[in-house]
């Protein structure tokens, strides 16, 4: 089985030895659209994060049986074309669930506490010019 990873940079050096042991593996740091067919022409499995794989590309890859997306989103893959050709498409379900929740909470707290406003207030020097050590220009909030 020949496995090709088109954009290894996207996994930030994570250990993928278990994938490499599954067959003849070749990984590319990045891949431009015009390099996809040449690099994958004998591949059974293609792993991608951002590289687009459309119907025309699939038609040029007769051995392709599986596309693995190293992300949650699969908008770079023509899913209908893959289904029509019997090519399975899998993604990294739930890999960033905690990060998304943390980012959402962080953003909510940032908005609630007006972090951007106060960051600019301090950096602009307005804080040091103020007659008082507090600022009542904005409402305060607590959780």
Model-derived regions, located:
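N-terminal glycine-/charge-rich "phosphate-binding" loop or analogous flexible N-terminal tail
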Residues: 1-43
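Phosphate-binding beta-alpha-beta segment of Rossmann-like dinucleotide-binding domains, i.e.
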Residues: 85, 93-143
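A short, aliphatic-rich alpha-helical micro-motif
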Residues: 39-40, 58-61
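Short acidic active-site motifs
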Residues: 32-36, 52-57
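Rossmann-fold NAD(P)-binding glycine/threonine-rich loop
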Residues: 75-87
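Short beta->alpha connector loops at strand-helix junctions that form conserved
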Residues: 29, 70-71, 87-98
């Amino acid at each position: 089985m020949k496995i090709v990873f088109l954009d290894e940079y996207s996994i930030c050096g994570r250990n993928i030895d278990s994938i490499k042991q599954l067959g003849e593996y070749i990984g590319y740091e990045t891949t431009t659209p015009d390099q996809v067919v040449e690099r994958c022409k004998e591949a059974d499995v293609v792993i991608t994060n951002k590289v687009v794989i459309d119907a025309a590309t699939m038609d040029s890859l007769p051995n392709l049986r599986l596309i693995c997306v190293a992300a949650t989103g699969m908008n770079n893959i023509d899913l209908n074309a893959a289904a029509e050709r019997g090519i399975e498409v899998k993604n990294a379900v739930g890999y960033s669930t905690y990060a998304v929740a943390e980012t959402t909470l962080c953003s909510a707290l940032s908005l609630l506490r007006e972090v951007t406003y106060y960051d600019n207030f301090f950096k602009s020097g307005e804080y040091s010019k103020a007659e008082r050590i507090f600022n009542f220009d904005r409402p305060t909030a607590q959780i």
